[in-house]
Every structure is written in structure tokens, then in C-alpha cells.
């Protein structure tokens, strides 16, 4: 049985840990709100660009050709795997890694290229023998548009050089702080819907072709940026949930240790009283 001194040390240690997990929960909660706000602010912009592109892709643009719209036989795929830089986020990192490995399962290493965003997917995939062509890190919980642009530029270069035939982004979609879903989204080639109903007509300056040439890469960048924001919110939501659980568990452990400590003290006091009474009786 542990001594009273040992129990006091354990209670102090668990209390210190609880303070740390509580602080981490509060930080994750504040950052989660900011990430959600950014994602919500980005959505209308992305939706509007998508709407214009869908309208234009169904228009008669004589002579317009773009490799970004060119569907070709898929022999090699570029995977952009988005994950976390840090741990202590529950099953967030393991879930996205598991999903990514499922996408690569059974495929020869010469049929895919991998770009990672986040230290966790980079290190985990390297440890499993996956060659990483390019890695980005240091911004998983606070991505910027420039990060998305750099990632998309790397993938686009591979695609335009015909080193890959499609680009797929693997990231975690944020539902709420308790639910995050790993998923894959094809970025290239850009899909052209066949049944889009024509709506409002647009006037383009200087021309529809030049506007489309400018919008296509922007659309890809904003799509990657949205994926980074979704992943950031998912990471922070998972971390907040994990730290909430850790804080609650620490509280329960402190209560249990406190009860054990009080019982030990009560037993010690009872023994001391018994010894005093026994000594007094012996002197009579």
C-alpha cells in the first residue's frame, strides 16, 4: 500500500497535469473558433468561383484548351496528404494516416507521388517506407492562403510535366468537435459537370478565355486552402475533445487518490488513538 507521502506526491503530480491539459483545451477551443470562422468566410468565395467555372465550362469557348481540364488515362497519381504537426489530438493523426494508406494499398510505388502537409503524416509515411516527394510543415493548425498556393504549385508542376495524371487531396473534413471524417477529393483534372443548367449570363473582360485561364488555378488554390482549414479545425476539435477527456479523467483520479489518502490518514489516526488508549490502560 502506498504511504501518505507517496499519495500526496501523486495528487500533486496529477493536479499539475490537469492544469496543463485544461490550458491546452482552452487554447485549442479558441483556435478552433478562429479556424471555423476562416472556413466559413472562405466558403462563399470558393462557391462563387465554382459557380462561374461551371457556367463557363458549359459555354461555347471556341478554341479554348487547358491541361487542367484534360482528362487522360491515369497511370500515376499525386496524393496530397494533409495532417497535423503535433500530437495530443486523439485519433486525428492515425485516422488520416490509415485512410491515406488504404488509398495506396496494393499500388506500386512508381504509380504514385506523395506530397505531405504536416509532420505527422510525413514521419508516419516515411516510417512505412513511403517516399515523400515534397513535405510542408509548421502550419497545420493555422494555415494561410500562401501555404495552399505553395502546395498546389508543387502538385500542378507535376501534373503539367505529365509526371502524374491526376491529383488527389486527402484531408479531414470538420463536422463538429466530436466528429471529423477523413476523405479524398480529386483536384486535377478539374471535372466538368455535364448537366449544369445555364443561368445568369456574364460579360467577361477582356475575354471569357482569359478569365477562365486565370480562374482555374485560383479555384485549385482555394480548394486546397479550404482543405487545409477543414483539417486545422478537425485537428483543433480533436485536440479540444482529447484534452477535455484528459482533464476530466485527471479530476476523477485526483478524487480517487484523495479518498485513498483520507482513508489512510483515518486509519493512521485510529491506530494512534488505539495505542494511546492501550498505553493509558497499561499504566492503570
What are these regions (language model features)?
Residues 1-284:
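C-terminal beta-strand-loop-alpha-helix "lid" module of Rossmann-like NAD(P)-dependent dehydrogenases
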